């Protein structure tokens, strides 16, 4: 009974987190739209074109999204990085930068662990090509300490905080 209560609490937390992300993003887009509108009605066309060509907002939002994804995922799977590394040969273990939670390789496998196995969907999320995802997956299977054909099945066995 306590375990069900805990699982429901975890679900509620992550549903609330999802809505917070969505509403925060909508609010940012409204602010951005209003800023562009003010620039346009004041006929600052050069500035408008500069803003529209800039990828700064998208880059900032992607960085925030990845950070939030990493935190949420590691909240669900707190031992994921060490469990993942346990599946690799000693000389192939992933060493993250001090400020990084996950890197692109780990995000690919985090998405796989969540059940997203389609390389196209993973590529869309990570804003890279499907061949890049395929290459990362192949490279990691080749670094595995376990049977390379079983590597992704072993990833799926990494347990979350609510699993016993």
Can you name each region flagged by the protein language model?
Residues 2-104:
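Membrane-proximal linker segments that couple transmembrane helices to downstream signaling/catalytic modules
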Residues 57-164:
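Cytosolic nucleotide-binding catalytic cores of signal-transduction proteins
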